[in-house]
Amino acid sequence: MRKTLLAILAASAGLVACTRTAGPELIPAENFADTVNGSPVALYTIKGGDVTLQVTNFGARVVSIFTPDKDGNYEDIVVGYNNISDYVTPPGERFFGACVGPVANRIGNAQFEIDGVVYRTPANDNKVNTLHGGYIGLDNVVWDVKSVTDSSIVLHYLHPDGMEGYPGNKDITMTYTVTSGSEFRIDYLATTDKKTHINISNHPFFCLRGEANGTVEDYVMSIRASHFIPIDPLSIPTGEIADVTGTPFDFRTAHTIGQMIGEENEQLRNARGYDHNWCIDRETE
């Protein structure tokens, strides 16, 4: 009886093992071994806990994030390309996984003023506004790799004074880290030698079922925010901070993204869906 039980347990363990993948099917590093504008680019892999991240120094961009599902099968949960050439000359979306800036999002009328001086930036959005830095930004340049460990990578770029109209030499460092607890963290550090605007961000497109697998409209989401920032028809903030109560922007109680996305609402119409900033509520002590 004992031998029979052991055999059953061993067979069961083998069956469970067969349902789990050995690990993520990573993008080959040779797909990114190239030069862009005379500078070498590469693909780097870091890992922490159950999460594996692949990053390229072209645009300091996240190429893939592999995580296991409840059955232990790994999927890449961000959308992107599998080779460097498609990032250099994208067949579609330019900003997949990229570091965007020096000013993420839009600059109205492609200009801003500091101390009475007007600075003009590229009108690369509807020929009116500046989007994510301009035609070059931080996503179309090769970053220096300062250090790489098993779980982190540090990238650096000096955005020179006057590039695409922005004042100041902007010394920018980004650190991607995957912790032993399977947390993905991004740390930004920027210094400048002139007054300027800095608003750096990362631009991943998440698809939690796996890359390009279905819509996000049935994802359940909650946002601890009582207010959001309305935009005009060209996606420029109006300057108002609006209450979410009674609007499709109220995610304080979790519900699917698609539950109210089809409602008749000026803000949804302006953005053709959700493309807004929420003002996160401070936690009470």
Regions found by a protein language model. Give the residues of each.
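An exposed, glycine/acidic-rich loop-and-rim segment of catalytic or binding clefts
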Residues: 19-285
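Intrinsically disordered, low-complexity segments enriched in polar/charged small residues
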Residues: 7-8, 208
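Hydrophobic h-region of N-terminal signal peptides that target proteins for export
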Residues: 9-17
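Positively charged n-region of N-terminal signal peptides that target proteins for export
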Residues: 1-4
